[in-house]
Amino acid sequence: MNSVFKRLKNYQEVYYLGENSVFQKSKIKGKFHSQYTRYGQPNEVAGGGFAKRELLELLPSDTEEQTDITITHRYDRNLKKDAFHLVITKGTGVELTASNERGLKYGMEALEKAIYLSNQQVVVPELTIHHEPSFPIRGVIEGFYGIPWTHDSRLDCIHFLGKHQMNTYMYAPKDDELQRKLWREKYPAEKIEDFEELLVASQNALVDFYYMISPGNDIVYTKEDEVGVLQQKLKQMIEIGVSHFGLLLDDIDYYLKGEAKQKFGTPGLAHAYLIKQIYSYLKNELAHSQLVICPTEYDTCYDSVYLHELSDNLPPEVQIFWTGPETLAHEIPTSDIAKMSEIFHHPTIIWDNTPVNDFEDDKELLFLSPYYNRSYRLNQFGVVGIVANPMSQWELSKLTIGNMAQLMWNAPGFDLTTSWQETLADYAGSEYVESLEVFTSHNENKRMIQPLPLELKEALEMRDKDNLNQSLTELNQAVEKLKTLSNKTFQKEIAPWFKRMEQDYQLWQAILAEDHELVRKLGTELKGAKVRIGTNLPLTAALLWGLVD
């Protein structure tokens, strides 16, 4: 395949006949002229401004320097948000059309990917690229139970999202008490400063920042002042510039009692009332706002009185979360979303609980799988977005989320095998791809796929020590290689599982040596360990073979 098509394979439409403009230099200069908006300072241009790039240096339209190409940026209201149309013509002309800043940024990224160096000459292919991201909303919801992320992790997450063509960060940590349990209380000044910093980071990365609140456990639906307290809590966020909000009514007892039951009759009508109050408030306070809600019945694939009453009584613009047919969905097939689209009648956002590991004993594990078992056709049935709920280990969550980003960006072109290789290479570099692939294959997300493949199950049942030894030797070597990866955050988060692998390998060596006393000692210790490798081969073998009680 031609190298230009290889570099641009993640874009939906690429037309290239093999013609190029060749410049006898190792870097070219481009003049940027926008008919879309006027930029006061060069660094305000989306996509990195006029900062130095590898092969292309952008200069403002009023530059007096000699340039090699001219990039003309135009606005087209008919293009979808985040879409772009890029045309590179013979000679010096580049036309980039978009309908928002992100579209401009993504078009500039495509231009940079198209340009390449050959024999110390810059080659600019003559081509046309048209791309519309498969989902308007693409990102992360910090919505897990357990210790919330640090402020630095959130900043890093926002940076990661912007770098990987995602555009949404949702703040919804279940154990932020002021977001859920103590929702009536205002945030202190220092916390507001953190939100302001997150908002600035989001704006710089062209990421939409959502503030989510969860009052459903104890809000009194019949008291107007309760709604007022909730509105004033949201006003704290409005005052610092937040315009995207979520009202979460998940994981609550939604059966009505007393006055609430007398007034509303059913939880669907009570929830619709509250949502409409918040929706109206946001519309009055802001010229532009967005509201997404999480219903209490967020994980079904069938209709109900609750969903009927809720969906029929909400303003049409309100978006609804759905996790798929289960809270931790093993799969989200086309048939299920087709059914739910007939039930919701509202724009739907998939709250995908992957790679989150906060359920039951999942916290002992790492979930490091590709983005398995999701329909590529979700956007054909009213799904406007996908947000991933990550692990508390943000750094390690980047693997699955980086892979998800590729489907969100271009669902028809998503190839699970090649995209996973690209994800691993993007994260760690080509030197570590093989080792990462081995380690992640032993730490699959058990909520999406069986963590123990058939060949290893059979090896355990048949006491096939040779095959098991080969697999464990490869895993041990992969861990040793990954220990040299110069990413301090990666090493800190993964250290407990590397330590567990060392202990597992000691147990395996004792099994091979038929040192039964040592096997019992090590196996008994590992039974009570706080973390474990997903395949858990040595301890499983010791238990299955009767070597450890």
Regions found by a protein language model. Give the residues of each.
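Catalytic-core regions of glycoside hydrolase
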Residues: 116-119, 143, 243, 255-414
